[in-house]
Swiss-Prot record:
This is Small ribosomal subunit protein uS9. HAMAP family: Ribosomal_uS9_B. SUPFAM superfamilies: Ribosomal protein S5 domain 2-like. Belongs to the universal ribosomal protein uS9 family. The lineage of its organism: Bacteria, Pseudomonadati, Pseudomonadota, Betaproteobacteria, Burkholderiales. InterPro entries: Ribosomal_Su5_D2-typ_SF, Ribosomal_uS9, Ribosomal_uS9_bac/plastid, Ribosomal_uS9_CS, Ribsml_uS5_D2-typ_fold_subgr. One of its GO terms (molecular function) is structural constituent of ribosome. NCBIfam families: PRK00132.1 (NF001099). PANTHER family: RIBOSOMAL PROTEIN S9, SMALL RIBOSOMAL SUBUNIT PROTEIN US9M. GO terms for cellular component: cytosolic small ribosomal subunit. One of its GO terms (biological process) is translation. Gene3D superfamilies: 3.30.230.10. Pfam families: Ribosomal_S9. The gene is rpsI.
């Protein structure tokens, strides 16, 4: 805890989010912009708010987020993971509910590397018999 802020780091794919929460009115600021402005798609905003809705703290915290790397979906997932960890830092009693919903676990799926002689990670060149 830094002063009256609680902190959580979230990661998803290549995105990393540093999340700071404190008691407040429910404002979420991502990289200096309101969450509605930063995440253009509705799905991104929904993903970010999931842990707050689950715990019933949607209007209870002011949240500041710094996020970098990856794309929109990866960043939304990283912010969700960071908010979850910050909520657990604030109140450890919330962990079972968040864990049950699957928000505590870091999604370990990463992009598979492209292999030599293949077009993509697994897509091979077309085989010609003759």
């Amino acid at each position: 805890m830094i002063g009256n802020w609680n902190y959580g780091t979230g990661r998803r794919k290549t995105s990393v989010a540093r999340v700071f929460i404190k008691k407040g009115s429910g404002k979420i600021v991502v990289n200096g912009k309101p969450v509605d402005e930063f995440f253009a798609r509705e799905t991104g905003r929904m993903i970010v708010c999931q842990p707050l809705e689950l715990t019933g703290h949607l209007e209870s915290f002011d949240i500041k987020v710094n996020v970098h790397g990856g794309g929109e979906t990866g960043q939304a997932g990283a912010v969700r993971h960071g908010i979850t960890r910050a909520l657990i830092d604030y109140d450890a009693a919330l962990k079972p509910a968040l864990s049950q919903a699957g928000f505590v676990t870091r999604d370990a799926r990463e992009v598979e590397r492209k292999k030599v002689g293949f077009r993509k990670a697994r897509r091979r060149k077309q085989f010609s018999k003759r």
